[in-house]
Amino acid sequence: MSLLDTLQRGLADLDAQGLRRVRRTADTACDAHMTVDGREIVGFASNDYLGLAAHPALIAAFAEGAQRYGSGSGGSHLLGGHSRAHATLEDELAAFSGGFSDAPRALYFSTGYMANLAAMTALTGKAATIFSDALNHASLIDGMRLSRANVQVYPHADTAALAALLDASDAETKLIVSDTVFSMDGDLAPLAELVALAERHGAWLVVDDAHGFGVLGPQGRGALAAAALRSPNLVYVGTLGKAAGVAGAFVIAHETVIEWMIQRARSYIFTTAAPPAVAHAVSASLKVIAGDEGDARRAHLAALIERTRALLRNTRWQPVDSHTAVQPLVIGSNDATLAAMRSLDAHGLWVPAIRPPTVPVGTSRLRVSLSAAHSFDDLARLEAALIEASEAQAVQKAAA
């Protein structure tokens, strides 16, 4: 059988299981109201939690950065591509979210995937053991596989199970790794307990705050700041394409850790640096996030979250107990979840269907992603459409 035959058979299998992914094409800027595939929709799919992706100040900064630095960086960070915009942003990020360390330093990456690969591979090796939450992001898992470290997976958020694994380990280097906000359930990691376990066992704790940075904590400084946690053995990863509304990611840790990553993190060294204009726009985003406007947007988002938690309970499906902008609604089968997504789409609402392998088999769900750009009228439309779709499925199930 040829490679093409194998791939075509694989695609047919995905179709039969309701697992093929389909891209949709946005014709306008990312916002609560946008044009997608030529249709006006209300989007509940993006991670633009503060509604900054189309903010005039960020757009102006992007244009200013392109005018000053050009359209591309021209090289890797170690071979001519590291600009003043990158350096300034790293200093700003360390000052903004590095309060957990006495000597914080930040390192800017082009994507969150690359930042997580760097943290997993540069800080470990064959003599290390990584202790990973079962629901960690795929980029962390891929980084662990590349690291050559021994990986032990503990049940989701189960600190007792983690403690038992740590007690039994004699590894030279121990790394506890966890998302802060879990992207498909919206729940929060037990960060205080994880920090305590790391300190008790001489381990390091790496946290991926992709869905917390900009939203959680005072001024949006992130999940560690929200929990008022400090420790010398922390490595903090954040992304800049979600709440920050631009692109890229960063790692903050003790300055020695960051210097080592500059020397050894392959996903930092062997790639062209992001355009300086992107970093310049992120600097503008940090000003909005940290200011009064950022506080107002977070307050509005918090109100939207509470309203959404209530309205999801009015459906026939199973909401997940989330207090974050990620609000999942578990339906179960792939076919039923896709049918629900199509029903919402007919009402001009874009709510993506999340299926295996992203979530466990039998837990396919709608993932409602909230933004400060949404209004309560948007939520009223969502509630009506969800109730209609869930009632229709209940009737069909009863008649079957």
Curated annotation (Swiss-Prot):
Its EC number is 2.3.1.47. Pfam families: Aminotran_1_2. The modification N6-(pyridoxal phosphate)lysine is found at K242. InterPro entries: Aminotransferase_I/II_large, AON_synthase_class-II, AONS_Archaea/Proteobacteria, AONS_Proteobacteria, PyrdxlP-dep_Trfase, PyrdxlP-dep_Trfase_major, PyrdxlP-dep_Trfase_small. It is an enzyme of class 2 (transferase). Its cofactor is pyridoxal 5'-phosphate. One of its GO terms (biological process) is biotin biosynthetic process. Pyridoxal 5'-phosphate binds at G112, Y113, S183, H211, T239. Substrate binds at R21, H137, T358. One of its GO terms (molecular function) is pyridoxal phosphate binding. Signal peptide: none annotated. It catalyses: 6-carboxyhexanoyl-[ACP] + L-alanine + H(+) = (8S)-8-amino-7-oxononanoate + holo-[ACP] + CO2. Keywords: Biotin biosynthesis, Pyridoxal phosphate, Transferase. Pathway: Cofactor biosynthesis; biotin biosynthesis. The keyword Aminoacyl-tRNA synthetase does not apply. Belongs to the class-II pyridoxal-phosphate-dependent aminotransferase family. BioF subfamily. Catalyzes the decarboxylative condensation of pimeloyl-[acyl-carrier protein] and L-alanine to produce 8-amino-7-oxononanoate (AON), [acyl-carrier protein], and carbon dioxide. Homodimer. This is 8-amino-7-oxononanoate synthase. The lineage of its organism: Bacteria, Pseudomonadati, Pseudomonadota, Betaproteobacteria, Burkholderiales.
